[in-house]
Structure formats: C-alpha cells, structure tokens
Curated annotation (Swiss-Prot):
Assembly and oligomerization: Heteropentamer, formed by a combination of alpha (GABRA1-6), beta (GABRB1-3), gamma (GABRG1-3), delta (GABRD), epsilon (GABRE), rho (GABRR1-3), pi (GABRP) and theta (GABRQ) chains, each subunit exhibiting distinct physiological and pharmacological properties. Binds UBQLN1. Interacts with GPHN.
Family designation: Belongs to the ligand-gated ion channel (TC 1.A.9) family. Gamma-aminobutyric acid receptor (TC 1.A.9.5) subfamily. GABRA3 sub-subfamily.
Composition bias, Basic and acidic residues: 31-42
Coiled-coil ranges per UniProt: none
Disease (UniProt): Epilepsy, X-linked 2, with or without impaired intellectual development and dysmorphic features: A neurologic disorder characterized by variable combinations of epileptic seizure, and a varying degree of intellectual disability and developmental delay. Some patients have dysmorphic facial features or mild skeletal anomalies. In general, males are more severely affected than females, although there is evidence for incomplete penetrance in both sexes.
Free-text note regarding domains: GABAARs subunits share a common topological structure: a peptide sequence made up of a long extracellular N-terminal, four transmembrane domains, intracellular or cytoplasmic domain located between the third and the fourth transmembrane domains.
Keyword Lyase recorded: no
Phosphothreonine: modified positions: 427
Origin species: Homo sapiens (Human)
UniProt-recorded name of the protein: Gamma-aminobutyric acid receptor subunit alpha-3
Disulfide bonds: 191-205
Keyword Cell cycle belongs to the record: no
Gene: GABRA3
Main location: membrane
Cellular component annotations (GO), alphabetically ordered: chloride channel complex; dendrite membrane; GABA-A receptor complex; GABA-ergic synapse; plasma membrane; postsynapse; postsynaptic specialization membrane
Length: 492
C-alpha cells in the first residue's frame, strides 16, 4: 500500500513538472524563460512571426503562384524552334527604334556609331493566357525559351548588346499572346560616302535590318508607328563634331537572293559636314598664300632675290597645304572640291613665279626721264671734218674779234637733277681754228632708269580679278547645291 502511494505521488510530481516546462512565459521559479534559437517571437520591426501572426491573405503570393503555374503551362510543350503560325500564316514583326546617341562618324573608315533601343513586337498564339494581370513583365531569361525573330543588321560591322549590370533586355507578354522585346544595342554600321563635294558634302548613312533566314513567305517586317514616327532621335543624342544631323528618312526594301526574297527595313540619317574647321585649316591659308604671291608684282624687277623668295616660298606652302588636306580623308581616286580649290590656288602661285621669270628674262629695260639719275658720257658730234690743230691757243678769233678761252681742269660731268637750270658752261662752246671747227653738244636732258615692267602692271590687275571671280563662282556653286539638298531632305 505504501509503495502504491509513493508511485502515485511520483507520477503527480512528474506531471506538474511537465506542465511547468511547457508553459511559454514562465520557468519553475516563476521567472520568464530565455528565448531559444528555434522560437518565433515578435521582431524588432514590429512584425509578427508566421507562428503567432493572424492568418492574413497574401494576394502577391497568390499572384506569383498563379503566374508561375501559367508560365509553366505555357512553356509545357512549347517548341521555340518553330515560328508562330507555322504553316498557317505569315509572322509579322513590328519594329521601332529610339536613338539615344548618334556618332561619331569616321571618314577614313566610312562608318558611324549609333546607340539605340531596338524594339520588336509580334504575336504568338501559343502564349495566350488568362490571369489577374493583362500585361506580364518577364525576365530576360525567358527570351531564350521562346521564339524570337532572327533580326540582324545588313550593314553592321559590329553590334554590341549591353550586359551591365544584367543583359539590357525587356520582355513583356500580353494576355492575347503579343510580345514586346526590347534591347539596347551599340551598332557600328557602314556609311558609303561620295566625297566629290568635300567639305561641302552631304551624306545619307543607312541603317538596314531584317530577318536572316526567313523569307517574305514566312516573316515580314513593318514599322510600328508608321514611317514618320517609328524612328526617333533624342534631342541631346548627337555626338557629332564635324557634322550636323539634318534628319532621317524611313523606308522598306525588298532584296532578292538565291534563297528567296527578304524584307529589309531602312533608315537613312542625313548628315551635313561642318565647313568651319576646313575654312580655318585650309581655305584661309590658301587664300592668304595666293595674295602673298601677288605681292611680288609690286616689287622692282631688279629685286631678284626678294621676288624669288616670294615665289618659291608660296609654292612650297601650297604643296604642304595640299598634302595636309588629304590626311583626314580616305584615299579616293577622284578629286574633291577642296582638291580643286587647292589646285587652282597652286596654279595662281606657280603662275606668279613664272611671271617673274618671264619679266626678268624677256622684258627689255625701258628708259624714262623720271626717277633716279644715271650719268651718261656726253657725245661729241663732229660737224665739220678737219685736221686737228697742232697748237692749242688760249684765244680764238671770230670775224676779226679775239675771245679768251676758259678751260676747266676737270673734264667730268656732274649729274644734273630734274628741273635744275642749265649753267653757262652748258651752252655750246665753239672751238675755232684756222683749219677745223668742232661743235661739242651737251645734253639738255638726262635719262633715268625705270624698273617697272608692263607685264607687272598688267599682272597687278589680272591676277586679283581672276582669283576673285574664281572664288565667287566656287562658293556660289556649292552654297546653292547645299540649299537644294536640304530642301530635298525636308520634302522626304
């Protein structure tokens, strides 16, 4: 009996201890129990743990679950190797482009760089769904699990899809099966250039894209918003230093090859070169060199060293300018507008040098009565031939009258400046003798040396006038051509 009571008390104690341990807030001594790692208690942010929180319906969790099931169902049995509507209809891919930056343009490589958001839209009946949302934003990873157009750029040398920090791709699925696929691309594309009008040239740089494998019987392309609004360039998107972006023209082409016909979407960006750099670098130096070469016409023709330096220096300068002007251009086989200008300037400079050589070699020296005095020996003209007198007398007799002769010691003649009055010694002196009579004539005028050539006088007028006419025709021609091209682009 005692053993039975003892066992009963022992079992009662164990039950009490068990109840105390399972109570959440107390210990055996009535103090609060410390938190164990596995318990869920009230968090610092004020939220309740799932264990103690009331049952609140989570719509986002339900939507995620719903769309997960929708995607799993859509991709179940989906074959991304087959295009939409295979065997029934042609797949239409609508495209549009937003240009974030345009440039730079390389003249030597004949290419340009463009950064775009490239958007494609198409319809896939296999991806229709019913759900709480009409448009389902998707991760770019899903793009590898569905069919996407095999679009490529016909004139692209290199295209880069941006992947920082993740692939810059956007994919949206509408409940009717329409997909929007957007990528950010940097494209290096060819730009054929015709440089006959350089540097007043205008270029149309194309951007062409289309399907690589699907012909027009399978896939066709069209512009999403029409030809006028499907290509947009950001207002601050120009990265051009030497060009102005005049506008763009959108179109569609059909190309034919041995494998069939393909649709090609085209956009031509019209560029006008800025001429300011070339005016400062080439045109003004050429004009100044030509003017400098014509200064030699105003120098005396006896100034051989000075005029030679003018001619040779200007010719060498034009040669240097013509070489440097070609460095920024591709090595084309035809002459550009700048080449023609430099060639004409070179001809003017070289002609000035040839003109001096002609004047110096062929033109005879002319004499005039003005300018610098050059002494000449006076000529003795024998009026009456007779035998010379044997004895010099200090007197001579004219009609029975005797006159003394005043003989000067210095027989040289001094230079007489213009306008000086003749002296008494300049009058004719008659030397008389019984047998001979001589008359010595002194010049009443003195001759001067004149270095001005008639060819120089003509060149001073002809060369500047011809050069001015050439510039007038040259600039008027290219300015009018530029205006006509701009008007044509606006009409398009």
């Amino acid at each position: 009996m005692i053993i039975t009571q003892t066992s009963h008390c022992y079992m009662t104690s164990l039950g009490i201890l068990f109840l105390i341990n399972i109570l959440p807030g107390t210990t055996g001594q009535g103090e609060s129990r410390r938190q164990e790692p596995g318990d869920f208690v009230k968090q610092d942010i004020g939220g309740l743990s799932p264990k103690h929180a009331p049952d609140i319906p989570d719509d986002s969790t339900d939507n995620i679950t719903i769309f997960t099931r929708i995607l799993d169902r859509l991709l179940d049995g989906y074959d991304n190797r087959l295009r939409p509507g295979l065997g029934d209809a042609v797949t239409e891919v609508k495209t549009d482009i937003y240009v974030t930056s345009f440039g730079p343009v390389s003249d030597t490589d004949m290419e340009y760089t463009i950064d775009v958001f490239f958007r494609q839209t198409w319809h896939d009946e296999r991806l229709k769904f019913d759900g709480p949302m009409k448009i389902l934003p998707l991760n770019n990873l899903l793009a590898s699990k569905i069919w996407t157009p095999d679009t490529f750029f016909h004139n692209g040398k290199k295209s880069v899809a941006h992947n920082m920090t993740t692939p810059n791709k956007l994919l949206r699925l509408v409940d009717n099966g329409t997909l929007l696929y957007t990528m950010r691309l940097t494209i290096h594309a060819e730009c054929p250039m015709h440089l006959e009008d350089f540097p007043m040239d205008v270029h149309a740089c194309p951007l062409k894209f289309g399907s690589y494998a699907y012909t027009t019987a399978e896939v066709v392309y069209s512009w999403t918003l029409g030809k006028n609004k499907s290509v947009e360039v950001a207002q601050d998107g120009s990265r051009l230093n030497q060009y102005d972006l005049l506008g763009h023209v959108v179109g569609t082409e059909i190309i034919r090859s041995s494998t069939g016909e393909y649709v090609v979407m085209t956009t031509h960006f019209h560029l006008k070169r800025k001429i300011g750099y070339f005016v400062i670098q080439t045109y003004l130096p050429c004009i100044m060199t030509v003017i400098l070469s014509q200064v030699s016409f105003w120098l005396n023709r006896e100034s051989v060293p000075a005029r030679t330096v003018f001619g040779v220096t200007t010719v060498l300068t034009m040669t240097t300018l013509s070489i440097s002007a070609r460095n920024s251009l591709p090595k084309v086989a035809y002459a550009t507008a700048m080449d023609w200008f430099i060639a004409v300037c070179y001809a003017f400079v070289f002609s000035a040098l040839i003109e001096f050589a002609t004047v110096n070699y062929f033109t005879k020296r002319s004499w005039a009565w003005e300018g610098k005095k050059v002494p000449e020996a006076l000529e003795m003209k024998k009026k009456t031939p007779a035998a010379p007198a044997k004895k010099t007398s200090t007197t001579f007799n004219i009609v029975g009258t005797t006159y003394p002769i005043n003989l000067a010691k210095d027989t040289e003649f001094s230079t007489i400046s213009k306008g000086a009055a003749p002296s008494a010694s300049s009058t004719p002196t008659i030397i008389a003798s019984p047998k001979a009579t001589y008359v010595q004539d002194s010049p009443t005028e003195t001759k001067t040396y004149n270095s001005v050539s008639k060819v120089d006088k003509i060149s001073r007028i002809i060369f500047p006038v011809l050069f001015a006419i050439f510039n007038l025709v040259y600039w008027a021609t290219y300015v009018n051509r530029e205006s006509a091209i701009k008007g044509m682009i606006r009409k398009q």
